[in-house]
Amino acid sequence: MSRRVLLILPCCAVASACGPNIEAETIANRVVMLTNAENEPLTIHKIVVNDRPGRSECVDTPAAQLGPGRTYTKTFFYCDDVQAVDVETDRGTVTIDPN
C-alpha cells in the first residue's frame, strides 16, 4: 500500500505544479495583461499582485472566461509596481513573473 502512495504522490505534485498555461505582460508596471495560451477556454477567478491578498487594490476577482488566445487586462493603479502575479483559474493556480 505505501508503495502505491509513494508512486502517486510525485505525480500529484507534478500535476498541481503545472497549472494553466497563461502568458503575462505588464505595461508601465501597473497594467497586467493575461493571455490564455491553452487550446481550451479557462476562467480566471482571482488575480493577486505582488503577493498581497490583504490589499484590495492588489486583488481582482473578475470571473472572466478567456477563450484560446484571448486576453484579460487589469490596471492595478494603486498597488506598487507589479513584480509577481498569482492567477487562480478553474484549472489551478499559477504564479507568473511578468518581468
Write out the residue ranges for each language-model feature.
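C-terminal motif of bacterial Sec signal peptides marking the signal peptidase cleavage site
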Residues: 14-17
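Bacterial lipoprotein signal-peptidase II cleavage site
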Residues: 19-25
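Short, solvent-exposed loop/turn segments enriched in Ser/Thr/Gly
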Residues: 27-30, 80
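Terminal connector regions
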Residues: 76-99
